[in-house]
Each structure stands twice: as C-alpha cells, then as structure tokens.
Amino acid sequence: MPVRRLDPVLIDRIAAGEVIERPASALKELIENALDAGARRIDVAIEAGGRKLIRVVDDGCGMAPEDLDLAVERHATSKLPEGDLSSIETLGFRGEALPSIGSVAALEIFSRAMGSAVGARVKVDCGVKEGPAPAAQPQGTRVEIRDLFAGTPARLKFLRTDRAEARASAEIVERLAMAHPQVRFGFASSDVRGFDLAACADSPEGRLTRFSAVLGKDFRDNALFVEAEREGVRLQGFAGLPTWHRASAAAQHVFVNGRPVRDRLLLGAARAAYMDFLPSGRHAALVLFLTCDPREVDVNVHPAKAEVRFRDPGLTRGLIVGALKQTLADAQHRASPVNGASALDVLARRGPGFSGAGGPANWDWRRSPANPGFDAAALAGFAEAPAAAFAAVESLAADTRANAAAPSLEDLEAPLGAARAQIHETYIVSQTRDGIVIVDQHAAHERLVYERLKAARAGSKAPRQALLIPAIVELARAEVEAILDAAVLLAEFGLIIEPFGPGAVAVTETPALLQDPDPTRLARDLAAALVEDDGAAALERRFNLVLATMACHNSVRAGRRMRPEEMNALLRDMERTPGSGQCNHGRPTYVELKLADVEKLFGRR
C-alpha cells in the first residue's frame, strides 16, 4: 500500500483523539484559554454531560476578527511570541485545541476585543469553517461546543453516563478555580448540581476561603499553612492534619506555576512526608502550589499537560517533603476537631433525648419509663460514687483517684488540661478551661516512644542495655532471614540480633529507651512485620516499621492503672511532642469536647 498524505480534517481528528478524550478535556482547554485572556469571571454551562453542549463565557481581553479567524487554524497561537518552548508562562501554548474540537464537533466562537465597537463570530462544524462575520457580543469571548464527537461517533461509546461526565467537568472547574481564586467561576449543568464561586483575594486567607468552598468547610478547620523556598523554587499552600485523612487521593491537589498537575513525583513526595502519620491505605488532603522559573520545568511532556518534568526533581521532592514534615512537626499535638464533632454526634444519637425518626426529642418526664432499659455491662468501668461526692468523684472503678485533689491552675491552662480520671484503665479524662479531653493512653504513649526512638537514632549512637542472659528466639526460616537482613538497621536503634543456629536468633542487647522490654516478643513481632513487608520496601519505610513495632511494645498498655502524676506527665509530654495528635497507625490519640457542645447534649444551649 503506497504512502499518502492524510486529509487535514483527518489529521485534526487524530490530534483530537489525544487532546480531547472526553467533554471535561474540551472544557479544560476552553477555561485555560479564558484564564490566559485575563478573565475575571468565567461562566460554564453543559448539557447531557457535555455531549450536547459546552458553553464557556468570559470577560477577558477578547479577539479581533483576524485573530478569531486564525484561532481555529491548526498550530496558530498568540502564546509563544518568541517561539521559546523552554519559557512557557501561559496555560495553553500548542494552538491545537480549538481546531481539534472543531474537527469532531460543531464549534462556534463569539468574541469582541477590548476597544472594538463590534464583535465577531466564527464557526467550524466537523472541519468545515464558516466566517468570521460581525456579531453582537460584549467584551470577552463566548465559546459553544455542540454535539461533541459527532465527527467521530465511535468515541461516544467510550464515554460514561451523563452524570459521570458532568461530575468530571465540575471537577475540572473546581481544580482550576482553586488555582485562580481571584476569578469568579460559575458552573451550571443539567445533570449535577451547579455552583458559583465568588472571587477571593489572591492571598493565603483568600485561597483558604476558595479551597473551603471547593473541599468543604472541614478543610479550613483542619488545614495547616505550608510555606518554604529553596534555590528559586517556592512552595505555598495548605496541608490537612494527619487525623483528617481520606479514603482516596482525590483531595490532593498540586499546581505548578498555576497549572493543575497529577504528577507522580509530587504526589509521591507528599506521601513520603505523611508516611509517619497515616494508616495504611489512607491519604492526606492538601493543596500545594509550586512556583519556579518556567525554564526549570517542562510542561510539554504530556498530551493533556497533566504531568511536568523538573530540571532538578531531587530539589523539588526534597522541598515538598521537608516543608510538609516541618509543618506537621510545628502542629505539635494538634488533632482534627472533626473527631470531637463525630463523638458528639454519636452521643447525641444515643442519648435518651434522641428521636430515631428524626422528630423532636421527647423531654416529657411523665412519658419516661419508670425503669429505663440500659446495659449494666456498659457501666462496668464505674463504681457507685459515695453520697454527696459529686465535687470529687472518688470511686470510678478504673479511676486512679485523679480527682482526689483539685487540678492545678497551671494544668488547667495547658492545652490538654488537667487529668481528672482514668476510665476502664484505658482512657484519661482531663479538664480544660472550656471543655474536656479524652485521651487513649496506649495510643498517646506509643507516639511519644516512637518520637523518642526517632530522636535517639538521629543522634550519634542509640543507647543500649545488655541482657545478662541472651534471649534465644525460635522463628520460621523466612523470619530468621528477614530479621538478620535487617540486623544492621536494628542495631541503629540499639537492638542487637545475632544468628543462633538454624531457625533461631539471639537477642543480646535492647534499646535503653525501652524500659523492661520483652525481647522474645519484640523479636518475633519485628520478624513477622519484616516478612509481611517483603523486605523490599524503601529504607525509610523500613525505619518507620521498626520504630512503630518497638514503640508499640514499650507503650503504656490499655488496662494499666496510672497515678494522677503519671497521667498529667503524659499530657504534658503530648503537648511538647510533634505529631502526638495521632498514633503510629494514624488514629487520633485524643478527642476534645468543648463545654458549649456538651451543654447542647443536655439541652442547656
């Protein structure tokens, strides 16, 4: 078969297959054009998921008739005046989006340039061009795409439902809106709920307002401000508290010079920073902006411009990891307030005044049963208080008599308050100036030990304590191999493991930071964890795995009674320790309930 030149319309349709994958792809190109035109308001409307109609209206600088004529020609653009691909400062630059769309749909553009008396119109219907011609149009541009993929009907079979496609388009608008808070965005659809995002100041507070409008108000309550700079690369944004984690990475948004990207390097750096804090399979919420010289990043490496390449990827990754870790460390013991709100919701629903049908609560004492049913086992952690002892409860079954003395003023002023009781020998209840705090003693102490072990390893040499008689631990062959492979790593933490014949190892020294550890159990748990991790994990992940296992072994266990001074010491240590708001598995170590919220449970507010 001879080689022949392809028809120009066919060329455009092939190009459209790369650039325009779905309605959301076309919408993204149109919004980027509007932003490059300096628009301050962008209104989007779609019908049937974008298949029937995509309309984008902006108040940007607009185009003169001669520019409008060229705009629908292949590889015609106003965004590369110097022809330099190494210094791209606009969102669009290839000049192929509009002709690609016009080759597979009915594309109509109305535009009026600033200072022009009249606007112009051009239409391209599946590759057939009409115009430009004069048309009534306010300053700015209106682009309408009708019957998308009419020129390539086979592509329609690969689209999802109208609702799913509309949701994808809404997400595109939201993502670009987060990058440009100074622009007002409107979105209307026949398939999903629309929205209107008011313009905000292009400042940290203004951006947080825009992010909260997109990601929900809980993001504001759980967001930590991030800011760092290194060798001309600047990072700014907000990162969610580790205890406010999500089931997917959908709430992770990264922008490079104002361009939204889904780059593995950047998302991997965020994952590495949170590795110490999140449960397996959970993801942090964050919005990060990287700003650098356009010459330091290549944005022309992906058909949809969704990925970028940095000239120095190590610098960028190090900046993100370092900045996020420092931000999380500065948060100290802070945990998500959503945990307290969730606890209040559970209490409210289980309380005697809750109406399961959603109606008003019944507060009529005459209708209250004479002997209300309750589970006596639920009160097993409490003993009957002596008469007239409400001022100082002396006999919670698991109480360590923390209430025997009034809390000191200094402890009450502390963020986590003064310990008043221990419940079920597992939870510490403390009183603050404006509420109460409930602490999981094992989870909290586990995190404290974990951070101490990390600090000890960062020093010159972790202190050890030699065992008078080495502990001989019998293990499976795979476990012996795994723990001996990690022997050098374990020695950095002060744990010395030596081979002891087939199927066994000897523990000769343990970390001095671990008080009275069980060396046999510690070795077995470490071996099992290392085998489960396949031994092929990154070195940092293996460090964290070893640290977490050791910390768990030396933590205050649930079921251990604690004296008041021990409980208060634990609270003060939590306040001083970075990351103590969550345990090594990502669970919260405490829940805070404000007095005003507790009073609502009892109808006082």
From Swiss-Prot:
InterPro entries: DNA_mismatch_repair_CS (IPR014762), DNA_mismatch_repair_MutL (IPR020667), DNA_mismatch_S5_2-like (IPR013507), HATPase_C_sf (IPR036890), MutL/Mlh/PMS (IPR002099), MutL/Mlh/Pms-like (IPR038973), MutL_C (IPR014790), MutL_C_dimsub (IPR042120). It comes from the Bacteria. The keyword DNA damage applies. Transmembrane segments: none annotated. GO terms for molecular function: ATP binding; ATP hydrolysis activity; ATP-dependent DNA damage sensor activity; mismatched DNA binding. One of its GO terms (cellular component) is mismatch repair complex. It holds the Pfam family HATPase_c_3. SUPFAM superfamilies: ATPase domain of HSP90 chaperone/DNA topoisomerase II/histidine kinase, DNA mismatch repair protein MutL, Ribosomal protein S5 domain 2-like. Keywords: DNA damage, DNA repair. One of its GO terms (biological process) is mismatch repair. This protein is involved in the repair of mismatches in DNA. It is required for dam-dependent methyl-directed DNA mismatch repair. May act as a 'molecular matchmaker', a protein that promotes the formation of a stable complex between two or more DNA-binding proteins in an ATP-dependent manner without itself being part of a final effector complex. NCBIfam families: mutl, PRK00095.2-4. Belongs to the DNA mismatch repair MutL/HexB family. PANTHER family: DNA MISMATCH REPAIR PROTEIN MLH, PMS, MUTL, DNA MISMATCH REPAIR PROTEIN MLH1. This is DNA mismatch repair protein MutL. It comes from Methylocella silvestris (strain DSM 15510 / CIP 108128 / LMG 27833 / NCIMB 13906 / BL2). The lineage of its organism: Bacteria, Pseudomonadati, Pseudomonadota, Alphaproteobacteria, Hyphomicrobiales. The gene is mutL.
